[in-house]
């Protein structure tokens, strides 16, 4: 399995990757993207099984990325890892096709609970 982690903060990408490993997903290949536009290109070139995206990023936000993927007919598994945790934002994310929203600060247990139904 391959997971694409999209966040404009390199440090946050590393924290997400470390937390994935702590949650038991250390055998998955990880690909990084520095913003939504980079993630959109890497979905095509890397064919990940899951995208974990921040909400607020330059060039293309996480929700714009998700809408672009769905608009192109791409049903890739998609979830947000973000500090934007309002009920309205979560509703927008789910209506656009996100499977889950993990709110920062997060724990390995939060990742495991969100990812287990998606990755098995």
Spans of model-derived segments:
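C-terminal output helix
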Residues: 88, 106-115
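Acidic, metal-coordinating helix/loop segments flanking the phosphotransfer/catalytic sites
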Residues: 32-50, 71
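A Lys-centered signature of the CheY-like receiver
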Residues: 8, 104
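Alpha4 helix (beta4-alpha4-beta5 surface) of REC/receiver domains from two-component response regulators
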Residues: 64, 85-100
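Receiver (REC) domain active-site loop signature in two-component systems and cognate sites
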Residues: 57
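Two-component/phosphorelay signaling modules centered on CheY-like receiver
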Residues: 10-31
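Acidic catalytic/metal-coordinating carboxylates
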Residues: 35, 61-67
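Active-site residues of response regulator receiver
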Residues: 54, 82
């Amino acid at each position: 399995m391959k997971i694409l982690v999209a966040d404009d903060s390199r440090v946050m990408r590393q924290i997400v990757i470390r937390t994935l490993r702590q949650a038991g997903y250390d055998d998955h290949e990880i690909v990084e993207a520095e913003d939504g536009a980079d993630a959109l290109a890497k979905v095509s070139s890397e064919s990940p099984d899951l995208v974990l995206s921040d909400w607020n990023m330059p060039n293309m936000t996480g929700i714009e990325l998700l809408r672009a993927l769905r608009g192109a007919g791409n049903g890739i598994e998609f979830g947000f890892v973000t500090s934007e945790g309002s009920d309205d934002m979560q509703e927008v994310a789910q209506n656009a096709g996100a499977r889950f929203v993990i709110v920062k600060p997060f724990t390995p247990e939060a990742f495991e609970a969100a990812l287990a139904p998606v990755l098995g």
